[in-house]
Amino acid sequence: MKVRVGFGYDVHALVPERDLWLGGVKIEHTMGLQGHSDADVLIHAICDALLGAANMRDIGYHFPDTAGEYKDIDSKILLFDTMELLRDAGYTLGLTLIHISEPTRPLYISYA
């Protein structure tokens, strides 16, 4: 079995008047992430890691922020399309490990 490893990294600024999406889940918060799509940094990083492992460039190449069709798109669609690209190229996903960090501005989320 051949193993390939990819690393994904994504950053978006926290801004008011945007929804906050992480991993396809809407998080109740006063701020959201700025971006052309829904700005889900977690899914974007996963897409980059998968595409990188397959040597298929990056998310910006396949889903450019200059294309109107991706304006405010649900990033789960981008992940689905990324997985289709990988399957079409003969790849399967074995394992995904995820680390989320926000070093400059703590993101406090409480669950009651």
Which sequence ranges carry the predicted segments?
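Active-site His/Glu-centered metal-binding helix of metallohydrolases
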Residues: 42, 46, 50
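Glycine- and Gly-Pro-enriched alpha-helical subdomains that act as flexible
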Residues: 49-94
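Short amphipathic
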Residues: 3-10
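A short glycine/serine-rich beta->alpha loop
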Residues: 27-37, 65-70
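Histidine-centered active-site/metal-ligand motif
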Residues: 12, 36, 44, 99
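Single conserved hydrophobic/aromatic residue that forms the stacking wall/gate
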Residues: 98-112
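A generic structural signal for residues located within well-ordered alpha-helices
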Residues: 37-38, 42, 74
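Acidic-glycine-rich active-site phosphate/pyrophosphate-binding loop
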Residues: 11-26
